[in-house]
Amino acid sequence: MKNAIILHGMPSKEGYYEPNRECPSNEHWLPWLQHQLIIKDILAQTPEMPRPYDPDYQEWLNVFNQFTINEDTILIGHSCGGGFLVRWLSENTIKVGKVILVAPWIDTDKILKSDFFNFKIDNNMSDKAESIVIFGSNNDDQEIKDSIDKLRNEIKNVKYKEFNFGHFVYSDMKTKEFPELLQEAIS
């Protein structure tokens, strides 16, 4: 059975503890995409990663490893979640289905004090996936553009699609629907 794992990004600590804000796994387009995949008989999960405002790779890995991951798995990561997937793919030999990195962030400016992004990118990670597609935006922050440039330059056979959706969050997109991402996931 096909399945999908959709990983959220890294909110600020203040935003994370804001009582009226949704959990990161329920923000933006993530719940909409999860539902659309489920009604297409793809078991989709949007796990809530621990302390997303101060991500620890081992803690995230412990949650991620609870899921079945194989050639029928679609992996989708937004921002820091995309960066997590790049590291996971770089450090593992498991073959997966599609990988879609939405505004992936790999901390090229070394903002994080943790070792979350302390890894070497596997230039051949595309060999471990049916395909790897990066969704970027021409009006995202420069640090995201820098991350995307680095990934496009280092990963062989990566595809790129450009949009005008900012950081692919609700405040930039003005919608919780993301049909372009759904189409890429199921095509």
Task: Give names to the regions the model predicted.
Residues 152-170:
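Catalytic histidine neighborhood in serine/cysteine hydrolases
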Residues 55, 165-178:
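Catalytic histidine-centered segment of alpha/beta-hydrolase-like enzymes
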Residues 9-10, 48-52, 99-109, 137:
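Active-site nucleophile loop of the alpha/beta-hydrolase fold
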Residues 75-76, 99:
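Conserved alpha/beta-hydrolase fold motif
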Residues 128-129, 133-136:
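Short beta-strand/loop motif that positions the catalytic acidic residue
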Residues 140-147:
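Conserved alpha/beta-hydrolase "acid-adjacent" motif
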